[in-house]
Amino acid sequence: METLQMGLLSRSALFKYIIIFLIMINTRGYVLASQEQEAKTSVPEERQVGVTQNKIMTAQYECYQKIMQEPAHGKEGQFCNRTWDGWLCWGDVAAGIISEQRCPDYFQDFDPSEKVTKECGKNGHWFRHPDSNRTWTNYTRCNTFTHEKVKTALNLYYLTIIGHGLSIASLLISLGIFFYFKNLSCQRITLHKNLFFSFVCNSIITIISLSAVANNQALVATNPVICKISQFIHLYLMGCNYFWMLCEGIYLHTLIVVAVFAEKQHLMWYYLLGWGFPLIPACIHAVARSLYYNDNCWISSETHLLYIIHGPICAALLVNLFFLLNIVRVLITKLKVTHQAESNLYMKAVRATLILVPLLGIEFVLFPWKPEGRIAEEIYDYVMHILMHYQGLLVATIFCFFNGEVQAVLKRHWNQYRIQFGSFAHSEGLRSASYTVSSISEIQGTTYTHDYSEHSNGKNCHDMENVFFKTEKQYM
C-alpha cells in the first residue's frame, strides 16, 4: 500500500515537473524573442509584453492541469483530443464539429466579444492549414474590425474634447454675464454660478485626464500617484455637478413650497452640500479602489466600486425629481388665482430645472444596460458620450442663454450701447424716437423686477422670488 501511495505521489510530482518544464521552454522562447527586439523596444512596450506573457503562461498552466485532471472522453466515435494551441485551451470535440470560444484579451487589437473557431475534421484530427500543413485555429475574426474600432475610439475622443471645450466656453461666458450685470445678483444666481463653476472645473480635469493620462499609455504603465489623484478629483467634481443641481432643486422647493422660511435661507448649507458632501463618496471610493481594485490610474470601469460614486448621484437625482414634481403641483394649485405673467415666470424657472434633471441623469439609468453587438454598442457609445460630455453646454444654454431675465438685460444694454455710440446718428429724429421706444420697452421689461425688490444678505435681488412674496400675501 505504501509503495502504491509513493507511486501515485511520484506520478503527480512528475506531472507537475512536466508542466513546469513546458512553461519554462515557452518562457525561454518568449525571452529570446523579446531579447532580439530589445534595442528597438521601449519600456512601456516591454511592460506590455510582460503582461501578455504572464497571461499566456497562466492560461497554459491552467490548460495543462485541465488536460491531465479531466476524465478521458467516454463517448463512442471519433473525436479530436484536447489540446493547447499556444493561446487557448480546447477540450475533446466530436468529429465534424466546429468548436468556438471568445477571443483572448492578450493583445490590444483583439476584441474579446468576437469568436475564435477550431474545426475537428471527420477523421478525428484537428484541421490543418493547407499552406503550412500544421494544426490551425481561426483567430482572424478577433481583429477583423480593429481598424473600425480604432476609428470609432478616435471619433469619441475628439467628440469628448470638443464637447468639454464648448462647455467651458459657454460656461465662462455665462459666468461673465452673471458677474458683470450686478442687477442679476441674487441667491438663485449665486447657485447658478457655483453650478457653472463646478462644470467648468469638471470639464478642465476631464480634458487633462484624457489628454495626459488616458491617451498616454506610458504614463498609465508606470502608474504614478498623480494620475490616481486626477481620477479622484474627476470623480469628486462629477459628484459636485449633481449635488449643485440638487441645491437648485432644494432652493426652489424652499422658496415656493415652504415660502414662510424663504427669507431665512442661508447659502452656507448649500455650499456644504454642493462642495462638501461629494468628498465623502469620493474618499470612500478611493480607499476601496486602492484595497480591492487597484488598477493602473483607476481608469477601468469594469468594477462595481463605481457605484460608490454613482449611488449618491442617483439618490440626488431622485430627490431632485421629487422636489420639482412637488413644486409643479404647488404652482398648479396655488397660483391659479394669480396673474398669468407671474405664474409663467415661475413655471419657466421650474421647467428649466425639471428638464435638466432627467437629461443629466439618463446616463446613470442607461449605464448598466450596455447592448451587445458591434453596431448597437457603437450607437450606445456615441449617445452616452454626447449626454455625458456636453452637459456643461446644456446647463449654460438652459440656465443662462434661454433665461428671460438674462435676455432682457442683454437686450437693454445692447440698445443703450447702440444709442450711446450713435448707431442712429444719421437722423436726430430717429435717434430720439429710438431712445423713447427703448426707454418704454425698458420700463415695461423691468416692471416685474423693479416693482418688488428684495434685499437678501445685503444685496438688491431683482428676481422672481420677489413676486412670490407678493402672491403669498393673498393667501394670508
Swiss-Prot record:
SUPFAM superfamilies: Family A G protein-coupled receptor-like, Hormone receptor domain. Gene3D superfamilies: GPCR, family 2, extracellular hormone receptor domain, Rhodopsin 7-helix transmembrane proteins. It holds the Pfam family 7tm_2. Glycans are attached at residues 81, 133, 138. The keyword Transmembrane helix applies. GO terms for cellular component: plasma membrane. CDD domains: 7tmB1_calcitonin_R. InterPro entries: GPCR_2, GPCR_2-like_7TM, GPCR_2_calcitonin_rcpt_fam, GPCR_2_CGRP1_rcpt, GPCR_2_extracell_dom_sf, GPCR_2_extracellular_dom, GPCR_2_secretin-like, GPCR_2_secretin-like_CS. SMART domains: HormR. Residues 34-154, 214-224, 289-304, 367-381 are extracellular. One of its GO terms (biological process) is adenylate cyclase-activating G protein-coupled receptor signaling pathway. Residues 180-190, 254-267, 330-344, 403-476 are cytoplasmic. GO terms for molecular function: adrenomedullin receptor activity; calcitonin gene-related peptide receptor activity; calcitonin receptor activity. The keyword Nucleotide-binding does not apply. Its main location: membrane. Belongs to the G-protein coupled receptor 2 family. May function as G protein-coupled receptor for calcitonin-gene-related peptides and adrenomedullin. Specificity may be modulated by accessory proteins. May activate cAMP-dependent pathway. This is Calcitonin gene-related peptide type 1 receptor.
